[in-house]
């Protein structure tokens, strides 16, 4: 068997890798050391605290990945709108660089409208 599972996670014993849900409260996430963080429904996060903890938790990794899956939501002051705004600037640079665009080859964005 390549993977094992239990009620807490899916894991690969040979490498010590695991996929498991973690708290949505940033105060309970200190000490993480992750390769990948997945945030579901980013628009529902009232602050950017969880996002910042995940960014910090990937700091020791050369090819870390953080991504969000979300619907738009309504909060134009939150982390979701901030990421959306950044994504649009990166996407604008893809085929037609302009002064309002950002070149960031480390950022992938896909927006369905």
Model-flagged regions — what are they?
Residues 16-20, 27, 33-37, 42, ...:
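Conserved P-loop NTPase catalytic core
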Residues 11-14:
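Active-site beta-strand termini and strand-to-loop segments that position acidic
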Residues 55-66:
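Substrate-engagement module of ASCE P-loop NTPases
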Residues 1-3:
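Conserved helix-turn-beta segment of the N-terminal RecA-like "Helicase ATP-binding" lobe
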Residues 5-8:
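Non-catalytic nucleic-acid-binding interfaces of large nucleic-acid enzymes and RNP effectors
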């Amino acid at each position: 068997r390549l993977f094992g599972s239990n009620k807490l996670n899916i894991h690969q014993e040979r490498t010590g890798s695991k996929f498991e849900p973690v708290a949505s409260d940033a105060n309970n996430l200190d000490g993480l050391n992750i390769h990948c963080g997945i945030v579901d429904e980013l628009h529902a996060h009232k602050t950017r605290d969880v996002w910042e903890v995940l960014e910090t938790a990937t700091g020791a990794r050369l090819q870390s990945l953080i991504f969000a899956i979300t619907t738009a939501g309504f909060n134009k002051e939150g982390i979701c709108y901030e990421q959306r705004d950044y994504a649009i600037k990166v996407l604008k640079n893809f085929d037609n660089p302009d002064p309002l665009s950002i070149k960031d080859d480390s950022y992938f964005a896909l927006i369905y409208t």
